Amino acid sequence: MKLHPLIAGLTLALASSMCLTGCGTSHQEKSGAGPSSATASASSGYPATVMSCAEKLTFTEAPKRVLLLEDTDAPTLSMLDLLDKVSARAGKIDTSGYDVNTATKLKAIPQMKGTSLATGGVSVSTESILDAHIDLVIGYDLGVDRKALAKAGVKLYSPDANCDDQTPVNHADFGLVTKEVTKVGAIFGVPERAATLNKALKKQTADLPKHAAGKGVSAAALW
């Protein structure tokens, strides 16, 4: 199962149309003068718990080696300046909707061998994932063996729109995008960065009507 196209379109359109410079590199990070461990723990929000479909995942530190199935959550990771956490990707990625910088980063991520699914998407064996020392897979249940990975200590995070147990989404409410940003920010210990991004995204969508041109215009499209 792949990300619901309406939600993917909203997220990708916003990711391509905005650039938050320096959101992942603070003055402290550049200078090496970081906060105390207690302060860092508090600001990171750990331990953080998020739902991955029906499974509750708890993170005590940021994932270091991430596998992406196709480009699941790639726009969100890009906007949060977290693509450097992705060690491998599997499946095809259509980079035509991304800005040049993000597309270049995605293409540079090493590709892991997978099997194309008849319903779309890609499947990767547990052995391949463990051999690559992956600690988090961002994707969908059809692509991996969730239970086998859990036994090996590897988490599978699936966005809400990828879950079979969720009520089908017929209308892509913008709240789904900001909710996903919040969840990914929690997983990687950057809740403040996620909050800042959500504020910017909400402002951007609120400003859309101001930029609409033409007599009788009553709608603006994000995708």
Predicted regions and their residues:
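Sec-dependent bacterial lipoprotein signal peptides
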Residues: 1-21
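Bacterial lipoprotein signal-peptidase II cleavage site
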Residues: 19-36
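Extracytoplasmic low-complexity, Pro/Thr/Ser/Ala/Gly-rich segments
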Residues: 32-79, 93
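Extracytoplasmic substrate-binding proteins
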Residues: 56, 150-223
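Structural recognition of the beta-strand scaffold that forms the well-ordered cores
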Residues: 67-69, 87-90, 136-139, 156-159, ...
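A short, structured surface patch at a secondary-structure boundary
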Residues: 68-69, 74-128, 159
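Stable alpha-helical elements in mature extracytoplasmic
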Residues: 73-76, 82, 125, 141, ...
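Short helices/loops that flank or line small-molecule/ion binding pockets
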Residues: 122-134, 151-152
